[in-house]
């Protein structure tokens, strides 16, 4: 058997490899078992940081660290394997950056108000958004929504989320400080006038150890990325953790206190929902934001990875595969909420595995198995200092900024809405605000340009009008917060 001979494996293992080749159609896609497994490991290394970062972001909401860690590993493992087995696609899924931050910010912000939102309500909102996404996928409405929003605005959403993530990293690290009022005061709308203040946002003090270790982590990750080391973010986090342990910044005994190598599945927030609370508090906007962002984020990631893997050479086959992948992704959103984590989405880091030659679902299955094995490594993740994960957030923001070059800033009809979108997300600490102002301003400017004849005939899809009216109603009559 050629597979067995080329890999020097025992007969039984050779038969297993042969079955893998047959099931995943490896020859048809010009790949082999070894290449796929190596690609899967590469993808895992590039996105394993989510195991440390997701618990860091979600625990301020009141969710238990261990529960979030287990939910993250399980959701990533289960739905990445599902992507590999049912779609034969080399794409991995995990709780997404940006939406996890939005999830946390909505809950934390509500703590200072008369209508606090519980983690159970937040998970319910994620679950409902997943159901909506499934319906949109099955009914093909998702295609209409995707074509309705101008490309520049789609890219601005990606950039805005990147800046939003970077702001969180800068804040958590202490590199960025706000010397006006506490977060709770601001979110309770007890605003301090700042028009007379020369500086609102300031650089943190380098006498703070966390700030210093964040800078170390940033340079370490950046150098590894410049050297094109696969898994640069993960290795940067690990390197910073080792330095923190050696210098005493992290005390291993304290960090490992109460940790166990055997996963405690009883801590999982399984089916931790509160449907009545969601509609009592009025989380419709939050649900729609989850759905809206997930829609474009997933579409962009899946089309981009499908293109890199060569599936779009046959447009019909490519569209069919992306459609199936979107369905698995949609199920993953609700499935992740059932397990107790924020929105699960396709990871753009999957392109790292594709660059290593991954072409089939075997790449995804390998990545998924790695995530399931990581369940037994929670004590090691507990050693990771906040500075390392904060640096990872900042670097993820850098990576998402790459989409800015796709925005047409030469045309004000696209430039102004795009700027509102990407600027308001980080500076109002709310993804929904950026999307809302972007959509409304585009509809207004495109309509004025069309009616006045001062510009090209800009396409304003009827769905954009519907969204604009709903947004104006929300901010005008329901309050903008």
Model feature map: region roles:
Residues 62-81:
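Loop-to-helix transition at the N-terminal end of transmembrane alpha-helices
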Residues 79-91, 222-228, 289-297, 329-339, ...:
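Transmembrane alpha-helix interface/packing and boundary motifs in multi-pass membrane proteins
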Residues 45-49, 86-96, 133-136, 228-229, ...:
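Short helix-coil transition sites and intra-membrane helix breaks within transmembrane domains
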């Amino acid at each position: 058997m050629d597979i067995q001979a080329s890999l020097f494996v025992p007969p039984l293992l050779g038969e297993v490899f042969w079955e893998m080749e047959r099931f995943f159609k490896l020859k048809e896609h010009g790949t082999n078992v070894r290449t796929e497994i190596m690609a899967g490991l590469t993808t895992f290394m590039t996105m394993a940081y989510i195991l440390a970062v997701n618990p860091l972001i979600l625990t301020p909401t009141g969710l238990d660290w261990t529960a979030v860690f287990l939910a993250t590993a399980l959701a990533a493992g289960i739905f990445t394997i599902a992507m590999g087995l049912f779609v034969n696609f080399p794409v991995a899924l995990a709780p997404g950056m940006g939406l996890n931050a939005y999830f946390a910010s909505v809950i934390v912000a509500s703590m200072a108000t008369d209508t606090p939102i519980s983690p159970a309500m937040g998970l319910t909102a994620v679950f409902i958004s997943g159901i909506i996404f499934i319906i949109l996928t099955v009914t093909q409405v998702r295609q209409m929504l995707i074509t309705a929003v101008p490309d520049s605005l789609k890219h601005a959403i990606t950039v805005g989320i990147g800046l939003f993530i970077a702001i969180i990293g800068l804040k958590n690290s202490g590199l960025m400080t706000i010397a006006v009022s506490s977060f709770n005061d601001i979110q309770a709308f007890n605003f301090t006038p700042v028009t007379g203040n020369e500086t609102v946002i300031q650089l943190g003090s380098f006498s703070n150890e966390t700030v210093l270790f964040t800078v170390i982590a940033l340079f370490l990750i950046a150098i590894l990325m410049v050297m094109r080391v696969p898994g640069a973010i993960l290795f940067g986090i690990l390197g910073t953790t080792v330095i923190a342990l050696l210098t005493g910044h992290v005390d291993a005994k304290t960090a490992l206190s109460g940790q166990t190598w055997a996963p405690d599945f009883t801590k999982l927030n399984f089916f931790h929902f509160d449907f009545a609370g969601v509609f009592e508090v009025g989380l419709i906007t939050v649900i729609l934001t989850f759905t809206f962002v997930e829609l474009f984020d997933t579409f962009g990631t899946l089309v981009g990875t499908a293109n890199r893997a060569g599936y779009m050479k046959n447009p019909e086959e490519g569209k069919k595969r992306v459609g199936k992948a979107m369905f698995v992704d949609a199920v993953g959103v609700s499935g992740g909420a059932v397990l107790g984590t924020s929105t699960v989405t396709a990871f753009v880091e999957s392109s790292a595995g594709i660059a290593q030659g991954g072409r089939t679902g075997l790449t995804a299955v390998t990545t998924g198995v790695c995530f399931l094995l990581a369940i037994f490594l929670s004590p090691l993740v507990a050693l990771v200092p906040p500075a390392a994960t904060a640096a990872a957030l900042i670097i993820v923001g850098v990576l998402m900024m790459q989409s800015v070059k796709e925005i047409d800033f030469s045309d004000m009809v696209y430039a102004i809405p795009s700027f509102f979108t990407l600027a308001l997300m980080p500076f109002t600490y709310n993804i929904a605000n950026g999307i809302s102002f972007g959509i409304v301003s585009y509809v207004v400017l495109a309509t004025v340009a069309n009616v006045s004849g001062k510009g090209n005939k800009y396409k304003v899809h009827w769905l954009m009008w519907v969204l604009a009216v709903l947004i104006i109603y929300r901010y005008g009559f329901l309050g903008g917060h």
